[in-house]
Amino acid sequence: MNRLFLILLLLVGAICAQAQEKIRVACVGNSITYGSGVANREVNAYPVKLQGMLGDGYEVGNFGRPGATLLNKGHRPYTQQQEYKDALAFAGDIVVIHLGINDTDPRNWPNYQDEFIEDYRALIQSFRQVNPKARFLIARMTPLSDRHWRYESGTRDWHEEIQQAIACVAKAEGIQMINFFE
């Protein structure tokens, strides 16, 4: 995780070292970004920690929505949530996207997997429309616990398929992938 923050710091610094306005970093995602299950999330969610590391020259926004899916036909599409609208209005100079884990739900991936890459690219494009100079970082999904109640139902295999789809998006868009867990 420290390596991730070092990469983020270097990329952020390279974007606008001379800028007088704060550099805006939009953290887009699900409950992991939001900080669900993290003790004292207002202090310990990763966007808050990132803000502390980057300092006063940056404004980090936490636009995580618990349960959000990347898939537009998923059970809780991120693009239909208020957090998405808020993230667009924020118009980040850097956009960190960490979505996909909730798409492993049996209501989502088996039915709409063919739309995942297109939906992901459309999400990126929507942020480019509000800030054409935005820089993107796409996060690999968090590891899936074998204690998860759906682990044996196919979720484990879908998780790997989604990881591969995320890598395809990153390659197609020329966007750097990051990993919170290496």
Model-based region annotation:
Residues 1-20:
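Bacterial Sec-dependent N-terminal signal peptides
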Residues 5, 47, 124:
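Generic structural marker for isolated residues within well-ordered, non-membrane alpha-helices
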Residues 11, 52-54, 64, 128, ...:
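A generic structural signal for short, solvent-exposed coil/turn residues
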Residues 12-13, 40, 145:
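Alpha-helical transmembrane segments and their juxtamembrane interfaces
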Residues 20, 78-182:
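Alpha-helical cap/lid subdomain in secreted, periplasmic
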Residues 22-27, 32-118:
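Conserved SGNH/GDSL esterase-like catalytic core that processes O-acyl groups on lipids
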